[in-house]
Every structure is written in C-alpha cells, then in structure tokens.
C-alpha cells in the first residue's frame, strides 16, 4: 500500500511538471493539484518522517529495523543464558506483555493528543473499534505466538528458532487455503517447498550438533508459527472491516493476553516460582526484559513505516536480511557449535523467501504454465521435420 501511494505521488508530480497549461487560473484545479502533491503521512510514534524524501525514509526505516531487532534477538538470547532461567519462558512472556500494555497506552495517548490538540494527560484515547469477542480470539493467538516462541528457546538454539520464523509462509499458505479459500500460484508453492526442505535440513543439522536438542522445542516453535499464521488472517479481516488503528490492536491483544496468562500462571502456580526467580536476578530479568520489550515494540513501528513507505515486498526482503544478520551475530556473540549444513540449508530457506517476494510482483499461475506448454508443443508440432539423406 505504501509503495502504491509513493508511486502515485511521483506520477502526479511528474505529470504536473510536464503540463503547465491546466494550472493557470482555475482555483479548483489549483486546490486539487496542491492537495494531490502532499505526500502520505509517515510517522513513527511522535516522529514525523513525511517531509523526508523516499530514500531517506527507506534508510531510516531500515536502520531502525536492523538496530532494534538485532538488539531484540541479542537480549532474548542473553536472558536465556542466565543460569536456571530456561523453565521460565512463560514468565518472560508475562513481563513482555505487561511492558507492551504500558507502551500501547502511551502510544494511544500520543495519537489522541495529536488529533485533539489538548494536554497529554487530560486527553482520552479514541473509543474501541473492533468488537471485544474478536480481541478475545486475537489475545489467545497472540499469547500462543509469543509464549511458545519465548519458551522454545529453552529447548532450541536461537538460530534454529529464527529459521523456523523465516518459514512463516508455510502455515500462512495452508491456513489461507483452508480458511479463506485463497488460490496461490506455482511460485508460492515452490517457495513453500524450498522452505520445507531448508527447514528440515537445518533442524537435522541442529539435532546432530546440539547435545541438548529436544523435539519439544520444535513442537513449541511450530505451534507459535501456526498461531502467528492465524493472527494474520484475523487481524487483516478485523482491521479492514472496522478501520481500527494498529495501536488499538496491539493494546487490546497484549492486554487481554496478559490477563489470560496471569490467570493461567496463578492457577498452575508457575507465577510465584517465576516471580521469585526474577526477584533474585532483577537486572537480568526485569531490566533486560524492559529493553527486550521496548526494542520489540519499537521494531514493529519501524516495520510498519517501512511497509508504508516502500511496500510489503521490500519490507519482507529487509526483514529477511535482518534475520540473517541476527543469526550471524548469534554465532559470533554466543558460543555454539557450527556446521556448514547450517549455511546451505539457510540459503535454501532464503531462496524460498526470495521466490515468495518475487511472486508478489509476478503473478504466474498454473494456467499460464499450461498455456506456455501448449504453445511450446504446438510450435514443435508445426516445425518441419528434418530429413537427413545419406548417399552411398
């Protein structure tokens, strides 16, 4: 959407510069041309990037994505290196959700302040747009995604977890076919196949290199991907139907998810053991957890800005490059075994991601392939047969 908006602004400006006649005396035309030349608004929290050129917007968004998500991955892995913390991945999720509630509330007040022009602390956030029953479903899916993803680090290497996250297309493709009845082209299926092959190879290499490899971690991160795939479909439908801002979706999803998880941990008794452990290591848990949550929350804002300014395919390419850099940093900063199979299987996954991005710009269908095969067969049938005469 952002790519289309940026393109329309460039085309309008170009046509206006090439045609001088219509901009003469008509106030209507003058008003239209001045309003059409306004670029689409691009904000990251309270920072306005609207009046920067598209290249500057892209570079700032890329820098934010790389810096914040590399910091996010580093802090996440660092927290799990604390001795004895691995069983408390769900408590880390509870802490993260609590911080996200505070960040979301501040962002909603900032949005209301910008629109109402009143004091920041006297302004009230906009009323809720999406029905509560939808948020109850979104909160459960968000809890499954974040909780299972965090907890899987107790059983998997961080690079393996990131590789699994790169393969989100697989459950998204299957879920949208079964739930929404969408149709996909051959490039999408080729991308999913590459991801499956690379993922299986990477997991096999990890099971051979890591002595504490546990299939429970694979099950957890797979469950997180399934929840993440369902979130995309539910969020997209709800935001289109009710015109809800992203800050509202984040606030209610994580707020209700916090309530879910808090009740579950109270009933199971895991809350008190996790809280006691974190009180013994406040800096490594609550302190690093704050920076971990803040970098993740701000990273979401930069990704959304990148989508608006450069389009979803470019954003997907940037986030994929970010994940590759994160994996490299993980091997450099944290000691872990390495094998060349990690590299080759990772490249196969990257190929799948590239095919997925390429398919967004080139809508190749199975009908196109069949028609091309028919044309090729027709040309072969019409080509004159060559006779080779051998004279003796």
From Swiss-Prot:
**Entry membrane topology:** Multi-pass membrane protein
Highest taxon of source: Eukaryota
Which Pfam families did the record assign?
UAA (PF08449)
Q: Where in the cell is it found?
A: Golgi apparatus membrane
Annotated S-S bridges: none
Q: Which UniProt keywords apply?
A: Developmental protein, Golgi apparatus, Membrane, Transmembrane, Transmembrane helix, Transport
Region Disordered, as annotated, extends over 11-35
Any GO MF annotation of the entry: 3'-phosphoadenosine 5'-phosphosulfate transmembrane transporter activity
Q: Which residues cross the membrane?
A: 62-82, 87-107, 136-156, 159-179, 185-205, 212-232, 249-269, 286-306, 314-334, 338-358
Q: Name one GO biological process term.
A: 3'-phosphoadenosine 5'-phosphosulfate transport
**Keyword set includes Nucleotide-binding:** no
- What GO cellular-component annotations does this UniProt entry give? endoplasmic reticulum membrane; Golgi apparatus; Golgi membrane
UniProt key word Secreted = no
- Main function: Mediates the transport of adenosine 3'-phospho 5'-phosphosulfate (PAPS), from cytosol into Golgi. PAPS is a universal sulfuryl donor for sulfation events that take place in the Golgi. Essential for viability. Involved in glycosaminoglycan synthesis and the subsequent signaling. May be involved in hh and dpp signaling by controlling the sulfation of heparan sulfate (HS).
Record family assignment: Belongs to the nucleotide-sugar transporter family. SLC35B subfamily.
Can you say what this protein is called? Adenosine 3'-phospho 5'-phosphosulfate transporter 2
Species annotation = Drosophila pseudoobscura pseudoobscura (Fruit fly)
Ranked from the top, the taxonomy reads: Eukaryota, Metazoa, Ecdysozoa, Arthropoda, Hexapoda
């Amino acid at each position: 959407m952002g790519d289309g908006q940026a393109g329309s602004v460039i085309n309008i400006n170009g046509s206006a510069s090439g045609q001088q006649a219509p901009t003469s005396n008509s106030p209507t035309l003058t008003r239209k041309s001045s309003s059409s030349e306004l670029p689409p608004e691009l904000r990251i929290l309270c920072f306005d990037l609207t009046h920067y050129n598209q290249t500057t917007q892209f570079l700032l968004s890329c820098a934010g994505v790389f810096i914040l998500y590399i910091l996010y991955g580093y802090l996440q892995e660092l927290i799990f290196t604390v001795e004895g913390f691995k069983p408390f991945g769900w408590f880390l999720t509870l802490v993260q959700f609590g911080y996200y509630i505070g960040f979301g509330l501040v962002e909603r007040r900032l949005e209301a302040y910008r629109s109402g022009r009143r004091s920041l602390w006297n302004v009230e956030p906009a009323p809720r747009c999406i029905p509560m029953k939808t948020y109850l479903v979104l909160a459960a899916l968000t809890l499954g995604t974040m909780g299972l993803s965090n907890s899987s680090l107790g059983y998997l290497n961080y690079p393996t977890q990131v590789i699994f996250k790169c393969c989100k297309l697989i459950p998204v493709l299957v879920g949208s076919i079964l739930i929404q009845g969408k149709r996909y082209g051959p490039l999408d299926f080729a991308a999913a196949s590459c991801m499956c092959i690379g993922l299986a190879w990477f997991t096999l290499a990890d099971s051979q290199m890591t002595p504490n490899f546990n299939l429970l971690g694979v099950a957890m991160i797979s469950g997180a991907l399934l929840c993440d795939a369902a979130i995309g479909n539910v969020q997209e439908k709800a935001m289109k139907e009710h015109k809800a801002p992203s800050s509202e979706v984040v606030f209610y999803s994580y707020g209700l998810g916090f309530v879910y998880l808090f009740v579950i941990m109270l009933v199971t008794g895991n809350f008190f053991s996790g809280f006691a452990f974190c009180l013994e290591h406040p800096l490594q848990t609550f302190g690093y957890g704050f920076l971990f949550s803040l970098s993740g929350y701000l990273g979401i804002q930069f990704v959304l800005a990148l989508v608006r300014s450069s389009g979803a395919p470019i954003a997907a390419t940037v986030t994929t490059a970010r994940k590759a850099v994160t994996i490299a940093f993980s091997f450099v900063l944290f000691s872990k075994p390495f094998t060349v199979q990690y590299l080759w299987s990772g490249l196969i996954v990257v190929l799948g991601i590239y095919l997925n991005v390429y398919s967004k710009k080139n809508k190749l269908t199975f009908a196109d392939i069949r028609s091309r095969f028919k044309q090729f067969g027709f040309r072969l049938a019409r080509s004159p047969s060559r006779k080779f005469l051998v004279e003796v």
